[in-house]
A protein has these predicted regions:
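Short acidic/glycine-enriched loop/turn segments that link adjacent beta-strands
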Residues: 37-41
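Short beta-strand scaffold segments in enzyme catalytic cores
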Residues: 43-45
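Conserved catalytic-core motifs of GNAT/GCN5-like acyltransferases
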Residues: 28-36
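Glyoxalase I/VOC metalloenzyme domain signal
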Residues: 1-4, 9-28, 47-89
Length: 89
């Protein structure tokens, strides 16, 4: 049976997104890494050995990509839960 892999929370201001989720969860998200050529990077909160929460936002250390950033981050007015990923089993 398929299982939840991760939830995706996007924010045009990554620092703000991390602050929101840290405050709501009572945990501290850890840096994940950059998404090269997408202009984004992420922070992660691990729920268990199979499931995590991804906070994704604009990576100010990368050039703006030639295509729109994923999840509509370029046009977002506020952070939001934007998706999820499923583990096929």
């Amino acid at each position: 049976m398929p299982e939840l892999d991760h939830l995706i929370f996007a924010s045009p201001d990554l620092s703000e997104g991390v602050r929101i989720i840290d405050s709501l969860s009572g945990q501290k998200a850890v840096p994940g890494g950059p998404h090269v050529n997408f202009g984004t990077k992420n922070y992660l909160l691990t729920f268990n050995d199979k499931t995590y929460f991804e906070i994704i936002g604009i990576d100010l250390n990368q050039e703006k990509p030639t295509r729109p950033r994923p999840f509509g981050i370029d046009t977002m007015s506020r952070p939001a839960l934007v998706g999820y990923a499923i583990h096929p089993t």
